[in-house]
């Protein structure tokens, strides 16, 4: 049966030479498949004389068992090698530093508020604060807003229990500060305010900053100089053109709208004026002795201008992919 020994030797050599499982299965099929060489030897046993069949069958079965044992051993070795390679590729280096936690950032409106507050602090203004739910006196009466003024209408103001309102401006902060302090007064009052309005450039909740300067001899010239300097520093343009258009506000007289000249023409950025004498009287400040100016700007609008955002609602939809670009 030298032929069987030769065939087994060739099969074992073929098994030892394979480098992947697919190739190993092909070798197995070549020897033990339906038409495999060892399988064919088993099929030919029936043609042998009875006296030779038993010995030949035993020899072929031994060869088959040796082939299967070699095949199984090689298969296990290839599987082990594949697993080792996979583990090596996915190995963790425990000496490497860990991944840092994600770092948050400030909201673009907050960044704008801090920038504006910093500019006014450099001009001697202090930051004042107050409640967001106000009574009628602080939100309307003290500011010379009569009972029949349109600003008191339900379509413009959020009314809450007890006749109170969600403040429609940060002017009540100024009222509270003037009631608690005598001139000189030089403050800015940033904060959230509320009005019944909602579209691409308006929100029912938005951020406003108002300013107030009350002292001996404060004039409209001081108002223009202060706001012109602020706007040029905020927009980082020393040649920025600023104009003041006559307007009307019940709490200032005279009053003006503030415009800046942009690429597409004049753009309104706020309102201002000299504090109305009635407002000074309402907070126990003598208008015969003191004068002052006040102004108001929309922080959200300034954030839109600074960052080139055209839809105000994007700031408050909590879309991190949008907000992260400002960090």
Curated annotation (Swiss-Prot):
<dbReference type="GO" id="GO:0005524">
    <property type="term" value="F:ATP binding"/>
</dbReference>
<keyword id="KW-0436">Ligase</keyword>
<dbReference type="InterPro" id="IPR022911">
    <property type="entry name" value="Phe_tRNA_ligase_alpha1_bac"/>
</dbReference>
<keyword id="KW-0460">Magnesium</keyword>
<dbReference type="GO" id="GO:0000049">
    <property type="term" value="F:tRNA binding"/>
</dbReference>
<keyword id="KW-0479">Metal-binding</keyword>
<dbReference type="InterPro" id="IPR004188">
    <property type="entry name" value="Phe-tRNA_ligase_II_N"/>
</dbReference>
<dbReference type="GO" id="GO:0006432">
    <property type="term" value="P:phenylalanyl-tRNA aminoacylation"/>
</dbReference>
<comment type="subunit">
    <text>Tetramer of two alpha and two beta subunits.</text>
</comment>
<keyword id="KW-0547">Nucleotide-binding</keyword>
<dbReference type="InterPro" id="IPR002319">
    <property type="entry name" value="Phenylalanyl-tRNA_Synthase"/>
</dbReference>
<protein>
    <recommendedName>
        <fullName>Phenylalanine--tRNA ligase alpha subunit</fullName>
        <ecNumber>6.1.1.20</ecNumber>
    </recommendedName>
</protein>
<dbReference type="Pfam" id="PF02912">
    <property type="entry name" value="Phe_tRNA-synt_N"/>
</dbReference>
<dbReference type="Pfam" id="PF01409">
    <property type="entry name" value="tRNA-synt_2d"/>
</dbReference>
<dbReference type="InterPro" id="IPR004529">
    <property type="entry name" value="Phe-tRNA-synth_IIc_asu"/>
</dbReference>
<keyword id="KW-0963">Cytoplasm</keyword>
<comment type="similarity">
    <text>Belongs to the class-II aminoacyl-tRNA synthetase family. Phe-tRNA synthetase alpha subunit type 1 subfamily.</text>
</comment>
<keyword id="KW-0030">Aminoacyl-tRNA synthetase</keyword>
<feature type="binding site">
    <location>
        <position position="253"/>
    </location>
    <ligand>
        <name>Mg(2+)</name>
    </ligand>
</feature>
<dbReference type="InterPro" id="IPR045864">
    <property type="entry name" value="aa-tRNA-synth_II/BPL/LPL"/>
</dbReference>
<keyword id="KW-0067">ATP-binding</keyword>
<dbReference type="InterPro" id="IPR010978">
    <property type="entry name" value="tRNA-bd_arm"/>
</dbReference>
<dbReference type="GO" id="GO:0000287">
    <property type="term" value="F:magnesium ion binding"/>
</dbReference>
<keyword id="KW-0648">Protein biosynthesis</keyword>
<dbReference type="InterPro" id="IPR006195">
    <property type="entry name" value="aa-tRNA-synth_II"/>
</dbReference>
<dbReference type="GO" id="GO:0004826">
    <property type="term" value="F:phenylalanine-tRNA ligase activity"/>
</dbReference>
<dbReference type="GO" id="GO:0005737">
    <property type="term" value="C:cytoplasm"/>
</dbReference>
């Amino acid at each position: 049966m030298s032929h069987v020994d030769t065939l087994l030797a060739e099969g074992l050599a073929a098994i030892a030479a394979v480098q992947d499982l697919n190739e190993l299965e092909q070798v197995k099929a070549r020897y033990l498949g339906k038409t495999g060489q060892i399988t064919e030897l088993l099929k030919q046993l029936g043609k042998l004389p009875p006296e030779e069949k038993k010995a030949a069958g035993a020899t072929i079965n031994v060869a088959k068992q040796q082939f299967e044992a070699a095949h199984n051993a090689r298969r296990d070795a290839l599987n082990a090698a594949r697993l080792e390679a996979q583990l090596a590729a996915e190995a963790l280096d425990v000496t490497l530093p860990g991944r840092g936690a994600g770092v948050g950032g400030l909201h673009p409106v907050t960044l704008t508020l801090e920038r504006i507050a910093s500019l006014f602090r450099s001009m001697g203004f202090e930051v004042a604060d107050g409640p967001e739910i106000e009574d009628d006196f602080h939100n309307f009466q003290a500011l010379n807003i009569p009972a029949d003024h349109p600003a008191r209408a339900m379509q413009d103001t959020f009314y809450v229990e007890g006749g109170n309102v969600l403040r429609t401006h940060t002017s009540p902060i100024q009222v509270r500060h003037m009631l608690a302090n005598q001139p000189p007064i030089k403050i800015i009052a940033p904060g959230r305010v509320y009005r019944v309005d909602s579209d691409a450039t308006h929100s029912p909740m938005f951020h406003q900053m108002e300013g107030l300067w009350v002292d001996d001899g404060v004039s409209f010239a001081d108002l223009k100089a202060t706001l012109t300097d602020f706007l040029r520093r905020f927009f980082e343009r020393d040649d920025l053109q600023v104009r003041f258009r006559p307007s009307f506000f019940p709490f200032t007289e005279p009053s003006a709208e503030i415009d800046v000249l942009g690429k597409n023409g004049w753009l309104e950025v706020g309102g201002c004026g000299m504090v109305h004498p009635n407002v000074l009287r309402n907070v126990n400040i003598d208008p015969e002795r003191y004068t002052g100016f006040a102004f108001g700007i929309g922080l959200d609008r300034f954030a839109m201008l600074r960052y080139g955002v055209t839809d105000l609602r994007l700031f408050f939809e909590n879309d991190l992919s949008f907000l992260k670009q400002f960090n």
